[in-house]
Amino acid sequence: FAAEDIKAADGVSEDYFKTDEKVGTITTDSNGIAQMGDLPAGKYYVKEVKTAHGYVLDKEPRYVDLSYRDQDTPVITYDEKWQNARQKVKVTVLKKEKDTERVLAGGVFGLYTSENIKNAKGEVLLEKDSLIEQRVTDEKGQITFTADLPVDGKYYVKEIFAPDGFITTDEVQEFTFEYAGEDQAEVS
């Protein structure tokens, strides 16, 4: 997009672009690189309009100054590193006494994989039923797991140790972390 009116070099011809006019569309390649060439000198901005599956769209525009430098600079270039955040999942557990609904501190819970977790090459990073994270319930009977989980994975939470005076439950809570779209940074 043009960040300002991009005037013709001769000052007489029609302007190349008006402020906020879309100049073009670029798409990153398999290496994450996007390029656009042959732009007239001027100030521009780049806006991300779509991102890869599992990532959060970065709505902040990046401003690019391709203004004339000097007679010894034949081509003006601009490089910007743009890194998107991965979508996160927030997993919260509430431990209560069965008959009274009283919250219980001191329960130990684990977050586990329900299936093998693989990298982009298909290599197993974590095997099925691996413990990812372990937490203890606080005075409000709550835990929030903070592990950075891969999107589209299947997981479960189960109690490892009950609070003092209680019996550990065998109950397992399964869930799937599904991608909720590029506009949502966290899913719970």
Q: Model regions: which residues?
A:
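Solvent-exposed loop/turn and edge beta-strand elements of beta-rich ligand-binding domains
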Residues: F1-S188
